[in-house]
């Protein structure tokens, strides 16, 4: 990362050409640049139409400029914005003009957000929420990211940390006055009450995290079954485009095919697996092995078949739904959708899940004609809503959050051990405070910062 005393700039809007493009500038020379290229500084936070000229006074564009004096800006530094016409040549001319000034350079990925973090405009959990919002593909992911960006976890962690500091101060005061009667005991008692309540609150948050971390990556649905029963046709139907090769020859699919979908506002990854059967072909055997492995890891398995749906289903820890395909070949029998079909006993590893859709749901469809697909998709959406029910409102959205909160809870628990010396109680509380400080990005997180901010786009 370049020194933060340099002034940076970058395109902050989307791909060119476009109707409008916005170039953001942040740093100590932002005001100088704006004055040099437009003739004067506009009033703070006021859009002004300007003629933008380079250092030779050649006209670059007729645009709009805004000025935000630090620290009352997005980054906490002086910030200028150039709103120009979104042509590539216009942007190139403005970039050349900005680059001609000393101490001014293009920004690196995430550098604007990192400067905002370093200047106290947002904590690390809020920066992660911004990253999640930028990468959100579904409505549920967007809602979760907005809550994180709004300080859902950060505000709580700051309050917890303040309580730990207050309790530590009481305990250390008791240590200082240990030789004066029962002062230490009088100070220790309320501190331990605070610690116990705080531990219970963090433990409750950890217990309620549900599947919030999975909401960022999505639920996995595996389509499995024997060869040539229409698995590839089904995934093409669900994706509404051709993602898998469809052939009347059995064994066409040899590897796992994945497609990311938005079903009911939830992120769902659907995988098409090789047909599961006995084979002497080593390539097909590997495909079957991978199919069984992915089905075993899935959150929901659609076991596709035709006819009477006899035979073995895959062993999985998730629900397995029987989906009878090709009902269009049975002379129009049935309208498709959920049916009360007898389901063959599944492998011992299968389990029934709570909620409306368990491990014994069954459907009739025609993947080719689309018959019954509406009911199947609606059922998957309902399953996803139940699957992610607790994840949208949970505080924790990343493994990093969970790990640090677990560390803090463990240290608080140790500090509550009976007859633990006050000095050791204070040390455990100090370590718990450090864990929460790392959660907020205030303590020893340089490596984490580099990884997080590198995921942002250049203009963010």
UniProtKB/Swiss-Prot annotation:
One Gene Ontology term of the molecular function aspect: ATP hydrolysis activity
Pfam name, any one: MnmE_helical
Cofactor note as given: Binds 1 potassium ion per subunit.
Keyword annotations of the record: Cytoplasm, GTP-binding, Hydrolase, Magnesium, Metal-binding, Nucleotide-binding, Potassium, tRNA processing
Binding, (6S)-5-formyl-5,6,7,8-tetrahydrofolate: 24, 81, 121, 460
Subunit structure as annotated in this protein's UniProt entry: Homodimer. Heterotetramer of two MnmE and two MnmG subunits.
Name of this protein: tRNA modification GTPase MnmE
Gene assigned in the entry: mnmE
């Amino acid at each position: 990362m370049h020194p933060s005393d340099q002034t940076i700039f970058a395109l902050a809007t989307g791909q060119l050409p476009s109707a409008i493009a916005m170039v953001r500038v942040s740093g100590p020379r932002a005001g100088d640049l704006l004055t040099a290229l437009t003739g004067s500084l506009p009033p703070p936070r006021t859009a002004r139409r300007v003629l933008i000229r380079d250092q030779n006074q050649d006209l670059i564009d007729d645009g709009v400029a805004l000025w935000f004096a630090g620290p009352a800006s997005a980054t906490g530094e002086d910030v200028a914005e150039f709103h120009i016409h979104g042509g590539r040549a216009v942007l190139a001319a403005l970039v050349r003009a900005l680059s001609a000034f000393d101490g001014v350079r293009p920004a690196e990925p995430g550098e604007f957000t990192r400067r905002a973090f370093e200047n106290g405009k947002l904590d690390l959990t809020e920066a992660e929420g911004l990253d999640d919002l930028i990468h959100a593909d579904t409505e549920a992911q967007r809602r979760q990211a907005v809550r994180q960006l709004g300080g859902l976890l950060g505000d709580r962690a700051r309050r917890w940390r303040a309580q730990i500091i207050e309790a530590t101060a009481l305990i250390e005061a008791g240590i200082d006055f240990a030789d004066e009667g029962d002062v230490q005991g009088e100070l220790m008692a309320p501190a331990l009450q605070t610690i116990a309540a705080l531990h219970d609150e963090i433990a409750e948050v950890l217990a309620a995290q549900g599947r919030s971390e999975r909401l960022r990556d999505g639920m996995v649905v595996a389509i499995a079954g024997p060869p040539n029963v229409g698995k590839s046709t089904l995934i093409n139907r669900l994706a509404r485009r051709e993602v898998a090769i469809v052939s009347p020859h059995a064994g066409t699919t040899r590897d796992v095919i994945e497609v990311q979908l938005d079903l009911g506002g939830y992120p769902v990854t659907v995988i098409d697996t090789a047909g599961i059967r006995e084979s002497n072909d080593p390539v097909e055997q590997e495909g079957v092995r991978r199919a069984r492995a992915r089905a075993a890891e899935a959150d929901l398995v659609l076991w596709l078949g035709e006819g009477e749906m006899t035979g073995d289903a895959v062993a999985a820890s998730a629900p397995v739904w029987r989906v009878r395909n090709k009902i269009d070949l049975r002379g129009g029998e049935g309208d498709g959708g959920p049916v009360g079909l007898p389901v063959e006993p599944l492998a011992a590893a299968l389990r029934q899940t709570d909620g409306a859709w368990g491990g014994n749901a069954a459907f009739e469809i025609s993947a080719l004609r689309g018959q019954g697909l509406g009911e199947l998709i609606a059922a998957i959406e309902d399953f996803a809503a139940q699957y992610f029910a607790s994840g949208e409102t949970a505080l924790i959205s990343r493994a990093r959050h969970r790990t640090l909160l677990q560390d803090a809870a463990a240290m608080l628990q140790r500090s509550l051990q009976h007859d633990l010396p006050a000095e050791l109680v204070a040390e455990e509380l100090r370590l718990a405070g450090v864990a929460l400080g790392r959660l907020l990005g205030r303590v020893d997180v340089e490596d984490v910062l580099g990884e997080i901010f590198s995921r942002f786009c250049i203009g963010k």
